[in-house]
Amino acid sequence: FFLVLAGLIIKLTPIGKYHAAEHMTANAFDSSLKLTIENVRRQPRVHKDCGTNLVVSIVLCFSVLSLILEDSVFLFLLTWAIGFELWKGEPKVIWDLIMVIGKVTQYLLFTSKPQDKHLIVAIEAMKRLEEKELANGR
């Protein structure tokens, strides 16, 4: 319930638009496209590395493990550990299924279609991050 409520609040406020703009800019950057409004606007508003995917993997792990284990600190720690490993680990077979759920969740609850002003902010933020990376020799 809490995730749905939080998602609706995010989706119905400018936060959802900025979140989508961030994803769209990251997708353009990941594809080595020039960061222009036109290029960014054509990108999907879901991203593979969004924290929503981590939350979905943790919730799914908790749902399964709570059927086997009783509520305890161990259950929560194990849930977080497995959820994180699914998010960042290899192989990605199980993750691909979770990713579908995560992307749908991102699209329906945690992002909304951004306007150009949201895209401009995200593009400028990415450009500044890129400048800092170059300045630090990365």
Named regions from a protein language model:
Residues 68-71, 89-100, 108-112:
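Membrane interface segments of multi-pass transport proteins and intramembrane proteases
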Residues 47, 51-59, 63-66, 91, ...:
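Hydrophobic alpha-helical transmembrane segments and adjacent short intramembrane/lumenal linkers
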Residues 1-19, 76-93:
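Hydrophobic alpha-helical membrane-embedded segments
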Residues 5-53, 98-138:
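Polar-ligand-bearing catalytic/cofactor-coordination segments
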Residues 58-84:
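Juxtamembrane "helix exit" motif at the C-terminal ends of alpha-helical transmembrane segments
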